Amino acid sequence: HHRRGEDFVDSPILTYLEPAASSTVELVVELFEYQRVEIEVLPTEATVMYAGMLVDTNYFRNHVGSRTFQIASKLKEKQANVSRAYEFLQDDYKTTQEKMSISANAYRFGNDILIAYGNEEEIYTRPLLAKVGNELLNIAEIKAVFVAGRVDKDRIAISARSKTEVNVQLIMEKLGGGGHFSMAACQVEEKTVKETIDKLEEAIDQYLDERG
């Protein structure tokens, strides 16, 4: 459901791009209708797909349309366990501590953009960085959030989230990443967290200048 990037696979058997779709799950379930035989979906599979929609839409808050809820309804018809899907996404105590430590480093960049970052010595997962971004975006006056953290010894990832006014996809593309308007990401190699944040601030400034 992201638009085609520079690293798009060459000569695929099937290309199905729909940037307006809320999630990959939305596209997959739609394809079921075009098959010659009925696709059997087990309740556990439907539950996992429902959880995927929760992640991609930030619990049906971002980038959703009527089709999104139609697909969710179809998964429910396939016996998706909604309560279980939410349980899949709950954090344990250690993860919660890590999220809090990153959030504690958050600072405002301009009036309505928030940048948060992890400690230089710590290794984080990309899903954790995304979760921090989703949670910080709930702050009323904040329009976009960027969360940076080291994901291995050579790479730092940035997870970007926005509401309706800031196109984080364009900002992440300036750093070699991609995504869509309200949800995007990138990774930077062989840089410190501080150097990565500096590059991010430059990309944001450039985007704001271009937007006018």
What is each stretch, according to the model?
Residues 1-3, 179-180:
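Histidine-centered active-site/metal-ligand motif
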Residues 2-72:
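Short alpha-helices
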Residues 50, 55-212:
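Hydrophobic helix-and-loop "lid/oligomerization" segment in the mid-to-C-terminal part
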